[in-house]
């Protein structure tokens, strides 16, 4: 089996231009069945639910942070398929090692990032309901949303922003190489 060079992975990454700070999801999941389990926020007056789509290599309780991501300056939201591709990229072992370096320690699982959804049917918006898709980072720490946990979420935010800018830089470099090749042929 041949490995794909990281530069090719970044070229295929969706064009993510902004990653918002983390929003903690007020629920816990069991890692072994978090892929398809929807949880309702017990503290929310509205009917708000979370789907984290976590595919974790360990078992036990997890808690999650949600990152809204945008594609451009108009804050267009990426498609779910683009978010899945981005989550696959940031979960890629050589890329994930960068997060471990930022956190200063090993992660408990091999896939802490996934594509998640927040759905609100409260009628708070003019449309009556809204759905936001984004990137979810899940954590296995003993004390959910403790200082240590938030430091991990902060490192995850830095990691997502770094990888998204790497994808943008890789595409820009590829365009420059392509222009140079065209000039040489002429």
Curated annotation (Swiss-Prot):
It holds the Pfam family Herpes_UL55. This is Tegument protein UL55. InterPro entries: Herpes_UL55. Keywords: Host nucleus, Virion, Virion tegument. It is found in: Virion tegument; Host nucleus matrix. One of its GO terms (cellular component) is viral tegument. It comes from Human herpesvirus 2 (strain HG52). Belongs to the alphaherpesvirinae HHV-1 UL55 family. Coiled coil: none annotated. GO terms for biological process: viral life cycle. The lineage of its organism: Viruses, Duplodnaviria, Heunggongvirae, Peploviricota, Herviviricetes.
């Amino acid at each position: 089996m041949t490995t794909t060079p990281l530069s090719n992975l970044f070229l295929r990454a969706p064009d993510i231009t902004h990653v918002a700070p983390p929003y903690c999801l007020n629920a816990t999941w069991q890692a072994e069945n978090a892929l398809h389990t929807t949880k309702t926020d017990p503290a929310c007056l509205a009917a708000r639910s979370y789907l984290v789509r976590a595919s974790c290599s360990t078992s036990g309780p997890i808690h999650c942070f949600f990152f809204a991501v945008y594609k451009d300056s108009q804050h267009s939201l990426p498609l779910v398929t683009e978010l899945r591709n981005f989550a696959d990229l940031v979960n890629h072992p050589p890329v994930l090692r960068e997060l471990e370096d930022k956190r200063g320690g090993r992660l408990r699982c091999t896939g802490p990032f996934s594509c998640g959804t927040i759905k609100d049917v409260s009628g708070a918006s003019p449309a009556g309901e809204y759905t936001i898709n984004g990137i979810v980072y899940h954590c296995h720490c003993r004390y959910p949303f403790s200082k240590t946990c938030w430091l991990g979420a902060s490192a995850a935010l830095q990691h997502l922003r770094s990888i998204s800018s790497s994808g943008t830089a890789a595409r820009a470099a590829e365009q420059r190489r392509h222009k140079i090749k065209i000039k040489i042929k002429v």
